[in-house]
Amino acid sequence: MKIRTLSGSVLEPPSAVRATPGTSMLKLEPGGSTIPKIPFIRPSFPGPAELAEDFVQIAQANWYTNFGPNERRFARALRDYLGPHLHVATLANGTLALLAALHVSFGAGTRDRYLLMPSFTFVGVAQAALWTGYRPWFIDIDANTWQPCVHSACAVIERFRDRIAGILLANVFGVGNPQISVWEELAAEWELPIVLDSAAGFGSTYADGERLGGRGACEIFSFHATKPFAVGEGGALVSRDPRLVEHAYKFQNFGLVQTRESIQLGMNGKLSEISAAIGLRQLVGLDRRLASRRKVLECYRTGMADAGVRFQDNANVASLCFASACCTSADHKAAVLGSLRRHAIEARDYYNPPQHRHPYFVTNAELVESTDLAVTADICSRIVSLPVHDHMAPDDVARVVAAVQEAEVRGE
């Protein structure tokens, strides 16, 4: 897609050498050789010269925030990318996008009702519910997809419908839920609003080929520096309903309208001009970068086919912040992580702990309810998260594959 700068020139695909952090080294043994570490996340941003050009234009316009020309163009560009039937509100970060989504979809709560959500997601999801006046009700996940389990939700709704204000559905790891239509039917049957947290999923598609962004009452994205589509700090709320997006814009500006009078509860959630400018540059060539990330997953799947790990369903059409895989057992997971460390490869095990096991929610257990979370506990005990980068070097991919294979062979 073509993106223009404030001066009207067309942005070219970012230079081959993008801004990346320095490389650290690991010494394998005393007196031995060193090898470069493979980082878990490698942010990929426009270079200093490109950022300087954007900042000069912003300084010349003397418009740094408050819905400036870059923000307006960025919102339109996001809509062009996601689909013309959608409407977009940009926000300062993904958390504020989620707060706005909950507020405009469910209204202000008084902490006497609950939002159904998986425990197997980032802890900011439950915190957002509390900030907007709702309590988390944790449901289990599906053993095959690791996405929120419809049957777990039904069991709660059928018994406690009057205590449930809505559904906060996570597209886990930014991967589109293959049962999204079933979830929407469930929400309609019980007259419950449904909001989708697709934080890491900008550029992902559902199994039917539709890009994330247009399901439920709304979906939100995070453009944090760790995401495949990143501006540093930023986010967006996307909906088919223009009125909901209009409310989101008011929410992020203290509820103010053109008369400078506040007509609804709000806060400051506006995206800065420099973040919007970065976003415009990041959109150029995005699909090529995402394709390169999916190629990494394909290599992992092929190379680890006999290593005893299973990758997430539908991840092959996701934007892939990282590659999640389940090991055969907790011991196998420990062996895989140990082998990765020895090979100077950074890895994680998201989402372990799940939300309900974070100390805040353990200490304040009266704030939450929970179904049986047996599958969540099992997946957390076996999951590993492997690095994925834009245009990841083949040698790095091969090193990750070899490390996982070695853990299986050695059976540590």
From Swiss-Prot:
Pfam families: DegT_DnrJ_EryC1. The modification N6-(pyridoxal phosphate)lysine is found at K227. The keyword Signal does not apply. One of its GO terms (biological process) is polysaccharide biosynthetic process. The keyword Cytoplasm does not apply. Keywords: Pyridoxal phosphate. Belongs to the DegT/DnrJ/EryC1 family. InterPro entries: DegT/StrS_aminotransferase, PyrdxlP-dep_Trfase, PyrdxlP-dep_Trfase_major. This is Protein Mb3436c. GO terms for molecular function: pyridoxal phosphate binding; transaminase activity. The lineage of its organism: Bacteria, Bacillati, Actinomycetota, Actinomycetes, Mycobacteriales.
